[in-house]
Amino acid sequence: MTDTNEPSGVNFKKDVKFSIIIPAHNEEKYIRKCLDSIAKASEAYKDQIEVIVVLNRCTDKTEEIAKSYNCIKLKNNDKNLSKIRNAGAKIASGEIIITIDADTQMAESMLSNVDKYLASGKYIGGGVTGKFERISLGIFFSAILIIIPLLFRYGAISVGIFWCHKKDFMEINGFNENMLMAEDADFAKRLKEWGKRNNKKFGTIKNGMITSCRRFDTYGDWALLKNPKVILAYLKGNDRKSADKTYYDNQER
């Protein structure tokens, strides 16, 4: 059941260009770096940015941190990342939607690149490529083990941070709320298909993010290769038990 509270810290600024949506479930260890990266990327767009932190069953200091950065705060208790992100998009007032995970940092040039891509009229939106905070053989092969099956199932896409006009986000009904995992790849595929129908390309901004290695730090760099069932569940997309274990009930992820 959805439990969505009225947003607090609502931004009444006019002419908001970017609405940046962050789903957050107990992210006190990571979200400051994410918000600091957004602040740096936003310097050329003063008073044109709103950051919406969708608080998901938080029991730590995530809400307090979001408040200290003057973010718009919205509570949603669904164990479903699609519903969490869509709740943020629903209240967004910007013409451009950007979604980023709380353990990810955007590049300083990220917003200017999004602005450039969309202003060209050639792109429907897109994703980014990036890097992990650290790399090892285990992390490298784990990434390959995920990427190759995704390419076969969803085609040539990029994920990580998504960006598109809000009107296009709404046209494809946002993230698929029937999916509990791999909802990002599904969103990318549908956005790309929507772009083709409108004679626009799906764009990929290179070197657009740095993401944490928290799962590798917790479980080991080779853990994914030792447990291929996780990969199969991810590709399936609607395995509730695996989704809860991997994301929604896991405080050490």
Question: Predicted segment positions?
Answer:
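A short, conserved alpha-helix in the catalytic core of glycosyltransferases
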Residues: 168-173, 179-199
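Short aromatic/hydrophobic "clamp" motif used to bind/position activated sugar donors
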Residues: 97
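Glycine-rich, basic loop-to-helix element that forms the pyrophosphate-binding segment
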Residues: 76-92
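Cell-envelope/extracellular polymer assembly enzymes that use nucleotide-activated donors
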Residues: 17-19, 50, 186
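Short, well-formed alpha-helical segments that are part of the catalytic scaffolds
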Residues: 3-9, 27-42
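A conserved acidic beta->alpha catalytic loop
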Residues: 55-63, 104
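Conserved donor NDP-sugar-binding/catalytic core segment of glycosyltransferases
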Residues: 108-137
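Short beta-strand/loop segment that forms part of the nucleotide-sugar
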Residues: 47-57, 74
